[in-house]
Regions:
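Positively charged
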Residues: 1-173
C-alpha cells in the first residue's frame, strides 16, 4: 500500500526549523516508505522528512538517478567537502517550477545511519553530492533560495510566474 504524503508549502515555519537527531522510537521503515513513495509520486530525486511534515532528521535520495538506486540517510553528517565548487541548476519539490543556479562543492564525504541503524560512510560526487547537500540543507532549516542573491531569486521568481501564467492560458484554450 502506497504511503504518499502531502508536500508542506515553502512558507510553512516547519521548513525553517533545524532538525535534531531522529527520535529513538522512530519507525524507520515507515518513514522510509513514506519518503520514497512521496518522492516517486512527486517525481523528485530527493526528499527530506520535513518537506512532508515529519520533523525527523532523515531524507531519501537517488544515489544513482539513471539506475533509480536510492539511499535513506538518518542523522546524516558532512565529514569533509571539496574546496572546488560547481554552479548547476537546482529545483525543489517545495518550490515547483523554480530553478536556480546554485554553487556547491563538487565532492563530499558523508556519514549517515541506514534504516537498520548501521553507520555508513560514503564519498559523493557530481549530482549525488548535490542532491545530498540540497536535502541536508532542508534539515538545517535552509533551502536553495537562500544560496543565491536576492536579485537572482527575484528574476527566477518572475520567470516562474510568467510560465505559470502561460500554462493557465494554454489550459483555458
Amino acid at each position: 500500500m502506497s504511503k504518499i504524503c502531502k508536500l508542506i508549502e515553502a512558507e510553512n515555519p516547519m521548513m525553517r526549523v533545524r532538525l535534531s537527531g531522529c527520535s529513538s522510537d522512530l519507525d524507520r521503515n515507515d518513514v522510509e516508505e513514506k519518503l520514497f513513495d512521496s518522492m516517486k509520486h512527486y517525481n523528485g530525486i530527493g526528499l527530506s522528512a520535513n518537506q512532508i511534515g515529519i520533523m525527523e532528521r532523515v531524507f531519501v535520495m537517488y544515489s544513482d538517478v539513471k539506475k533509480r538506486e536510492t539511499i535513506t540517510c538518518f542523522n546524516p553528517k558532512i565529514v569533509t567537502q571539496s574546496d572546488t565548487k560547481i554552479l548547476m541548476d537546482e529545483g525543489c519539490l517545495t518550490y515547483p517550477g523554480l530553478w536556480l543556479k546554485v554553487k556547491r562543492p563538487d565532492g563530499i564525504e558523508v556519514e549517515y545511519e541506514d534504516k537498520n541503524g548501521e553507520i555508513q560512510n560514503q564519498a559523493m560526487f557530481g549530482l549525488e553530492c548535490r542532491i545530498f547537500l540540497h536535502e541536508y540543507d532542508h534539515m538545517e532549516g535552509t533551502n536553495f533560495t537562500q544560496k543565491v542573491s536576492k536579485i537572482k531569486l527575484n528574476r527566477a521568481l518572475k520567470r516562474r510566474s510568467k510560465m505559470v501564467k502561460r500554462s493557465k492560458l494554454v489550459e483555458n484554450q
